């Protein structure tokens, strides 16, 4: 039985959160990954931007793990017919030391 989009995304988001935390400097307590689909839509790769509001001058490039996770997200979205044009994926460290994440999608209406 095929997994739902939410089940696919849940697994991918966990991989992506771990990869994003690993890619950022240890002094960052939050990070944002912006993914933008090309004008032709999903399937042709995504533009990636990683940033921190606390450290706007720091430069972080996507690792292989981030690229693999975002490609998996793109392919899962295509497989389930979920056409989005932009995704902002945020991770933040809680006072307990644990990391939480949230993903927000922009879709054409």
Features from the language model and the residues they span:
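Contiguous interface-forming segments/domains that mediate binding rather than catalysis
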Residues: 1-109
């Amino acid at each position: 039985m095929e997994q739902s989009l939410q089940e696919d995304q849940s697994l991918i988001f966990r991989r992506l959160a771990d990869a994003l935390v690993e890619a950022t400097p240890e002094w960052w307590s939050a990070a944002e990954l912006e993914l933008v689909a090309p004008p032709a839509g999903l399937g042709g790769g995504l533009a990636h931007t990683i940033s921190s509001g606390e450290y706007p001058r720091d430069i972080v490039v996507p690792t292989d793990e981030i690229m693999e996770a975002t490609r998996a997200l793109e392919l899962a979205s295509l497989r389930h017919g979920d056409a989005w044009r932009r995704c902002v994926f945020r991770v933040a460290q809680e006072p307990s030391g644990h990391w939480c994440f949230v993903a927000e999608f922009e879709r054409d209406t």
